[in-house]
Design a protein with these regions (language model features):
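Short, hydrophobic, well-ordered secondary-structure elements
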Residues: 41-61
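A structural signal for well-ordered alpha-helices, especially hydrophobic packing surfaces
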Residues: 12, 16-19, 23, 49, ...
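Short charge-dense sequence patches
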Residues: 1-7, 59, 63, 102, ...
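Short acidic alpha-helical/loop segments enriched in Asp/Glu that coordinate divalent cations
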Residues: 25-30, 57-77
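Charged alpha-helical initiation segments
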Residues: 1-40
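Short, flexible coil/linker segments at or flanking structured domains
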Residues: 6, 35, 48, 83-86, ...
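Acidic, Ser/Thr/Gly/Pro-rich intrinsically disordered interaction regions
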Residues: 72-116
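Short, glycine/alanine-rich amphipathic alpha-helical segment
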Residues: 35-46, 80
């Protein structure tokens, strides 16, 4: 079994919980403290989603039996790892398309993460 699958799922689950909590805070109060808590929850969700993305890259690397999976922390590093073992991953190509589109959910997520 791929050890990265449960980590990716856990990060996404944490993100859902944080977003639900942030939505609740927004519904019940407009006080400054509640707004700050909501912002903190949403920023935490961005951290978890970015982390899920990195672990997903590692998951792909593990699936294709790349070497030094722990060093994969970007799409370029995944691509290098795949080239080193003469493999092509359609998942990589799909992610690359998303990153080329500045308005894709992945590009927007990573742009927000860089702002934090």
């Amino acid at each position: 079994m791929n050890p990265y699958v449960p980590v990716v799922n856990q990060k996404i689950s944490f993100c859902k919980m944080l977003l639900n909590e942030g939505i609740k805070k927004n519904r019940f109060s407009k006080k400054k403290a509640a707004v700050q808590i909501q912002a903190a929850l949403f920023q935490s969700a961005i951290y978890h989603l970015e982390s899920a993305y990195i672990f997903y890259l590692k998951e792909i690397g593990h699936t294709y039996r790349c070497k030094d999976i722990e060093s994969i922390n970007s799409l370029k590093k995944l691509q290098s790892a795949l080239i080193n073992i003469n493999k092509i991953a359609t998942e990589h190509d799909e992610l690359e398309l998303l990153l080329k589109d500045e308005q894709s959910w992945l590009s927007l997520l990573l742009a927000e993460y860089k702002k934090l």
